[in-house]
Amino acid sequence: IIGNVSVKQPVIYREEKKEKTEFVLPLKSINSERAKRYLVKRGIDLEIINECINSGLIYESEPNHNVVFLGTDEEKKYKYAFFRGTNDTRFMGESKGSDKAYTFRLLSNNESKRVHLFESAIDLLSYATLLKEKGYNWKENNMIALSGVYQTQKEISESKIPITIENFLKK
């Protein structure tokens, strides 16, 4: 059937392992006033903002005054940082070496099996604000920001679970 054509084995490409980059947190400002103003302007409840700042999950960076959303591992060691500009320019990104297994999250005070997923930290904080406004205890919910859009495959069985969700479900 193939005549004089030679037959070659298919080439197999292996996915290159990415070299781990050292995680670097943005420089922290002496206060978080601009970050607070920005988040309040976005409709986030001030008590929720202050709680996140006091628990070390949000701060304002220097010299650009970005809001920094942090993710920690089980030992409360920082592993992830996402920053967002507080001015009118749409500026955002992840800190060098961030581990997506530990994105920004607010975990329940109790043993809740329910988890709410959000594209971004701002979406997560907006939902917490809505819960509070409706009279619910926002601290009784596991809320995880995916820090980016997640698209499933046509066949759900072929979809990969985002690493931050996989990491949460292992607990």
Mark where each language-model region is.
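Short Cys/His-based metal-binding microdomains
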Residues: I1
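Phosphate-handling DNA/RNA-contact segment within nucleic-acid enzymes
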Residues: E62-L169
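Basic, glycine-enriched DNA-binding surface that flanks or lies within the catalytic cores of DNA
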Residues: V7-A101, N109
